[in-house]
A protein has these predicted regions:
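A hydrophobic, multi-pass inner-membrane permease signature
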Residues: 1-286
Length: 286
């Protein structure tokens, strides 16, 4: 294999450094602005690259029992409960559709794929949620999107890749479908489950559209509150007292951005080893 030329390596390094700066500098500006004083941000034209006197005042203001604290709890609860329920439903349905000879398996698969190709519109979805009595309830953020077809197809394909000999050996030992799923399929699918679980968690955490449709403002999750702070900052309820309206300073807006971004970023390091294992498993053939 020919060794890359120094010029080529230098070009790749410069391009990679440019991409890193393009990604990291905006986030650094957001964090720095959230830690700066209001006067320093105003003097800097609305943003600060590095605060001279860092302060946590913006974080104290929005986390002192106000709407952001409540919204953070809502988002965390919806993300945890929604991810667990979605994984449970997706795993069971994917396992059933991955096994040959399941009664009605192909029609169900075609029906699921049909919903992927032709998703329901906003008005039919709203009317369905209304008829089910789910308006202004947290269930409206989970039940309408409980199973994602893409994640279902990913898990189904992974389950189909498990050698049939393992299924046959379990059957000979007298294991039923649930025992096979719990004792054989799930332990072998940790990498796929981690990826799909992360997809679900990110989707639930970042969801704001359904909240704007189905929930009143006192039940909003964090992303909807974030949108209100950043896009319509002049019409906010006071984050500390819960009364009146204020114009959110730039420091408060950036602090809300950090609070909305950091929790989901912290999940990646814990799942990194499963991603690596999944890549190696797909690259090595027995």
């Amino acid at each position: 294999m020919e060794k890359p030329k120094p010029v080529t390596q230098a070009g790749k390094a410069i391009a990679l450094a440019a991409v890193v700066l393009l990604v990291c500098v905006p986030f650094l500006v957001i964090v720095s602005t959230s830690l700066a004083s209001t006067d320093e941000v105003v003097a800097g034209g609305g943003w600060v690259l590095w605060p001279t006197e860092p302060t946590l005042k913006a974080y104290r203001d929005i986390l002192d029992g106000g709407i952001v604290t409540h919204a953070l709890g809502v988002s965390a609860g919806v993300t945890v409960v929604g991810t667990l329920l979605s994984l449970a439903c997706t795993v069971t349905l994917a396992y059933a559709l991955s096994r040959p000879g399941v009664l009605g398996g192909r029609p169900v698969l075609l029906l699921v794929l049909f919903t992927f190709l032709f998703p329901p519109g906003m008005i039919p979805s709203f009317l369905l949620v209304k008829e089910l009595g789910l308006l202004d309830s947290y269930a409206s953020l989970v039940l309408p999107v409980l199973v994602n077809v893409f994640n279902l197809v990913v898990l189904r394909g992974f389950f189909q890749g498990i050698p049939d000999e393992l299924y046959e050996a379990a059957r000979l030992d007298g294991a039923g479908d649930w025992r096979v799923l719990v004792s054989i399929v799930l332990p072998l699918s940790k990498a796929a489950l981690a990826v799909v679980g992360l997809f679900y968690a990110v989707a639930y955490w970042n969801s704001w559209f359904y909240a704007s449709l189905y929930l009143e403002s006192d039940h909003w999750p964090l992303q909807q509150v974030l949108r209100t702070y950043v896009v319509a900052g002049s019409g906010l309820t006071d984050a500390t007292t819960g009364e009146g309206t204020i114009t959110a300073p730039q420091t408060v807006q950036m602090a809300v951005l950090v609070i909305a971004t950091v929790p989901i970023l912290l999940v990646y390091p814990f799942l990194q080893r499963y991603f690596t294992k999944g890549v190696l498993t797909g690259a090595v053939k027995s």
